[in-house]
Regions:
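Short beta-strands and strand-loop turn motifs
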Residues: 1-4, 45-47
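Short, small-residue-enriched loops and turns at beta-alpha junctions
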Residues: 6-10, 81, 98
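Conserved phosphate/ATP/ADP-binding segment of small-molecule kinases
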Residues: 11-88
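Short, small-residue alpha-helix embedded
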Residues: 37, 100-130
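Short, well-structured alpha-helical segments that form the helix of a local strand-helix-strand
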Residues: 61-66, 121-136, 153-154
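Short pre-catalytic strand/loop immediately N-terminal to key active-site residues, enriched for Gly-Thr
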Residues: 91-102
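Charged C-terminal helix
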Residues: 134-172
């Protein structure tokens, strides 16, 4: 599992992320700017760890990166995408508060790694994005702002069931 945090923000981060991607991780998960940068898109840059691009604009880069690295690439945003080089699956879940909370991307990468330990990579990544996004949607209804959202997501993950997932996530 590779989460190229801040790839594109500095030359050093981009270089290290590229070196790690060359080690054939099972899944690479990042925001659109990180995936665009890691795939070698000229002019791709991030604002620190925040994305300056939309996930749907990075699906071609994700597919190319998946082919080159021989892995599954997950791009997160308002809609998430999981690409294996042949095709991409879109995951519709989450909440607008999620990008405003620190460390949720890292938490999602940890959940994705756990799923990938027991299921095939593409299925694992799509399922992790759906479950985490559904947890975010439910948690956001219980919070008044982004500050308590990460803790509420943890609690919601603990309580996650099939009915909640079906109400708050859709794959296409």
């Amino acid at each position: 599992m590779l989460d190229p945090v801040g790839c594109g923000a500095t030359a050093y981060r981009t270089q290290v992320a590229a070196e790690l991607a060359a080690l054939a991780p099972t899944v690479i998960r990042g925001n659109a700017s990180e995936i665009l940068s890691l795939s070698g898109q000229v002019g791709a840059a991030s604002k620190g760890v925040d994305s300056s691009a939309r996930a749907e604009d990075a699906t071609s880069a994700a597919a190319t990166l998946a082919q080159r690295a021989g892995c599954v690439v997950a791009v997160t945003g308002a809609t998430d995408y999981v690409c294996d080089g042949a095709n991409c699956v879109s995951v519709h879940s989450g909440h607008a508060l999620m990008p405003l909370s620190t460390a949720l991307g890292c938490s999602l990468s940890a959940v994705t790694a756990a799923f990938a330990a027991v299921r095939p990579p593409k299925l694992a990544a799509a399922a992790a994005l759906a479950v985490f996004g559904a947890a975010g949607a439910v948690a956001a209804q219980r919070c008044q702002g982004p500050g308590h959202l990460p803790a509420e997501i943890c609690d919601t993950l603990y309580r996650m069931d099939h009915a909640t997932l079906a109400r708050h996530a859709r794959l296409s």
